[in-house]
Amino acid sequence: MHEAPRGFLEGEALRPRPFRAGLGHLGWIFAGGALGAAARLAVEGAARRLAPAAYEAFPWGTLAANAAGSFLIAIFGTLIFERFVGERARAFWVLGFLGSLTTFSSYALHTLRGWEASPLLGGLYGGGSLLLGLLAALAGLRLTRRLL
């Protein structure tokens, strides 16, 4: 079992350890990416089924996937910086699964499409996504520190 560095549980900043991804990690990244992409598709599909009219007007499925991914990546990021999670888990969860679940390109595209339809809608989505993502990441970080 790994121990947390001194000061971490009190909220001190940590220096991230470098990720040494190599060809041996590709399988883990691919597997995580496949599951992350499937999870994103499931979230988008659920959003479309639950409220088709709202889904067409506002990309809340993407918003939900990105917020959930921000929360989870903060948890895994905290664990990784603590060295509780090994390189394979980092490749699978962070680069693969969460990298596929959350995509900046989808965020940018939805923000631009919203802006074209209505600058207010585009601004709300773009700003709201950024704020919600940061708040979700902060919640994940604090929850992880509290539980450790």
From Swiss-Prot:
Record: residues binding Na(+): 99, 102
UniProt topology in membrane: Multi-pass membrane protein
Reaction(s) the record says it catalyses: fluoride(in) = fluoride(out)
Membrane spanning residue stretches: 23-43, 61-81, 92-112, 120-140
Keyword Transport: yes
UniProt GO MF annotations: fluoride channel activity; metal ion binding
Chief location of this protein within or outside the cell: membrane
GO annotation, biological process: cellular detoxification of fluoride
Cystine crosslinks: none
Lineage: superkingdom: Bacteria
Activity regulation, free text: Na(+) is not transported, but it plays an essential structural role and its presence is essential for fluoride channel function.
Family recorded in the similarity comment: Belongs to the fluoride channel Fluc/FEX (TC 1.A.43) family.
Reported function: Fluoride-specific ion channel. Important for reducing fluoride concentration in the cell, thus reducing its toxicity.
Protein known as: Fluoride-specific ion channel FluC 2
Gene responsible for this protein: fluC2
